[in-house]
């Protein structure tokens, strides 16, 4: 379910880890566009991390995957975004090429919606628990289905998708 303001309020002081924002391509159009919609990346990432935590967990006493360091980068790469790292040291990149594609019609609202949705998805990977005893992300479709399904569910629960955003059929 979507996190409500009461549940979200209990997470405001929860430590989400040391957030390091790095723009690896400040000269790119995608970077310039990003900076127009997100003026304080560290605070924005922290706010969205609290939303993810409030959606994934009932309380701060739950068994929560710790995040000590979160290195978030803007990079000139194909694709959209990805999370890597382990043991509380997490990195997430966001593609400036994707930012440019998402802003193709100069629609700031659409871009902000997409940027938030992508961030909710990737932050879910940072804070979610992983299934045990069924392999890993690369070797198990069941593992991937759990991980990606949960991230999409958190995004959807927080109004991060429109009905037309998800292709029908296929496998993810």
Where are these regions (language model features)?
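Active-site recognition of the HExxH zinc-binding catalytic motif
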Residues: 117-130, 148-152
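Solvent-exposed loop/turn segments at secondary-structure junctions
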Residues: 77-80, 98-101, 126, 133-134, ...
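Auxiliary, metal-adjacent structural segments of Zn-dependent hydrolase domains
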Residues: 32-97
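Post-HExxH zinc-binding segment in Zn-dependent metallohydrolases
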Residues: 131, 138-171
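Acidic/histidine-rich, surface-exposed loop or edge segments in extracytoplasmic proteins
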Residues: 12-39
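Pan-zinc metallopeptidase signature
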Residues: 1-2, 9, 171-172
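Short pre-active-site segment immediately N-terminal to the catalytic Zn-binding motif
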Residues: 98-119, 134-143
């Amino acid at each position: 379910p979507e996190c409500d303001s009461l549940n979200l309020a209990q997470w405001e002081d929860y430590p989400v880890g040391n957030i390091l924002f790095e723009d690896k391509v400040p000269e790119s159009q995608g970077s310039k566009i990003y900076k127009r919609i997100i003026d304080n990346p560290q605070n924005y990432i922290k706010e969205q991390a609290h939303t993810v935590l409030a959606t994934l967990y009932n309380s701060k006493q739950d068994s929560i995957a710790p995040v000590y360091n979160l290195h978030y980068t803007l990079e000139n790469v194909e694709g959209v975004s990805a999370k890597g790292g382990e043991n509380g040291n997490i990195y997430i990149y966001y593609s400036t090429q994707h930012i440019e594609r998402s802003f193709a019609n100069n629609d700031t609202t659409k871009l902000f919606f997409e940027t938030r949705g992508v961030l909710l998805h990737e932050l879910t990977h940072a804070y979610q628990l992983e299934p045990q005893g069924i392999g890993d992300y690369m070797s198990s479709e069941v593992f991937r289905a759990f991980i990606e399904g949960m991230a999409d569910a958190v995004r959807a629960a927080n109004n991060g998708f429109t009905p037309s955003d998800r292709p029908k059929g296929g496998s993810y």
